[in-house]
């Protein structure tokens, strides 16, 4: 499963600014699969705010999504088939240039967030940046490098940062994405693997995980669309095709430049015998 996101652009005292920010621009472009435009928005912000960790976490997220799209890993047939996710006979070959830039962005986010946490252990922006950095590390290791078991370590760390953030601010809705995904992920693991992993404040309750994702899809800001994407994947995995169709129709309307949303909606309409009109 995938996950991605960020805090507001205007200092961390207000997570959800009313005025569109460079981060709004970056995420709008990301959800439209306009990766270069998303990078450009973050490049401009970093030029003015080089010591903030948040834009580097977004930059890493854009690199991740570029690779997932390039390798066809975001196709529904892949994401709903655990055997295809785990298959290792012909692992996808990562773009080494992108991988280098991805790791650099992660290091930049991590180092800056750690400096902020030394000054204030409860800094929400730093915690969220680390949550995102560990989350995209998880996805890269699991989906691109095919190291599913090893990817559980950064997944645990990402969840730990999300749980710390939610204890500080239960209304920090974007953080529920990682918390919800962790619940669903642990609940989907085989028992013998669950025995060896521990996620902070996570019991493997898949229903609770879905409720957390619904919270993001309803009340989130930057990750609101991603909450809908993950709910759509859950619905497809659980054969709730009408619910998935509604989510995909909304995403296609909101992000018309995203070819994957249109393609997946078309496949689902055909499966259900709908015209899609």
Give the positions of each predicted feature:
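Bacterial Sec-dependent signal peptides at the C-terminal "C-region" and cleavage site
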Residues: 12-20
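Sec-dependent N-terminal signal peptides
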Residues: 2-13
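Short coil/linker segments at helix-helix boundaries
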Residues: 19-41, 51, 62-122, 129-171, ...
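A cross-kingdom marker for long, charged
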Residues: 233-277
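Short, solvent-exposed loop/edge-beta patches enriched in aromatic
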Residues: 47-54
């Amino acid at each position: 499963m995938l996950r991605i996101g960020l805090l507001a652009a205007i200092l961390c005292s207000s997570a959800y600014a009313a005025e569109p920010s460079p981060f709004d621009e970056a995420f709008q472009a990301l959800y439209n699969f306009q990766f270069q435009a998303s990078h450009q928005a973050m490049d401009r912000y970093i030029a003015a705010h080089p010591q903030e960790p948040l834009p580097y976490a977004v930059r890493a997220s854009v690199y991740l999504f570029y690779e997932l799209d390039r390798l066809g890993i975001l196709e529904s047939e892949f994401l709903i088939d655990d055997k295809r996710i785990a298959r290792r006979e012909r692992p996808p070959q990562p773009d080494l240039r992108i991988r280098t830039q991805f790791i650099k962005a992660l290091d930049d986010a991590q180092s800056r967030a750690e400096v902020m946490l030394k000054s204030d252990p409860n800094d929400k922006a730093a915690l969220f940046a680390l949550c995102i950095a560990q989350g995209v590390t998880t996805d890269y290791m699991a989906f691109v490098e095919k190291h599913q078991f090893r990817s559980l370590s950064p997944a645990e760390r990402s969840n730990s940062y999300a749980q710390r953030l939610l204890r500080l601010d239960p209304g920090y809705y974007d953080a529920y994405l990682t918390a919800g995904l962790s619940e669903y992920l642990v609940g989907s693991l085989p028992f013998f693997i669950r025995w060896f992993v521990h996620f902070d404040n996570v019991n493997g309750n898949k229903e609770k995980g879905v409720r957390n994702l619904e919270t993001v899809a309803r009340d989130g800001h930057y990750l609101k669309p991603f909450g809908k994407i993950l709910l759509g994947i859950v619905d497809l995995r659980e054969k709730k095709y009408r619910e998935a169709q509604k989510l995909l129709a909304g995403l296609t309307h909101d992000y018309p430049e995203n070819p994957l949303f249109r393609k997946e909606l078309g496949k689902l309409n055909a499966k259900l015998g709908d015209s899609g009109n």
